[in-house]
Amino acid sequence: MPRIAQAFARARAENRAAFVAYLCAGDPDFDTSLAACRALLASGVDLLELGVPFSDPLADGLTNQLAAQRALESGMTAARVFELVRRIREFSEAPIVFYTY
């Protein structure tokens, strides 16, 4: 069974909602994002959603717009988002999805 389906099945079996956490990858920088992901996953997050920063996120609210701006200013790119996932995979097999335009 795929990781995402397993996460929801496990939550359902435990009679609870799945805990899905969102972070803008690279906000405020790569290392802080990695540390935040590690902390969230250690805290029991079932599924991690990583926002891929975009230069013109008009559909997002101000908070996500500013997060994307900080991430881009710190050098985050699509390639670095995949590097972040590779680093997360060193300590977690939790499902990861992307939020992108």
Model-derived segments and spans:
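Conserved, mostly hydrophobic/aromatic
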Residues: 21, 40, 48-51
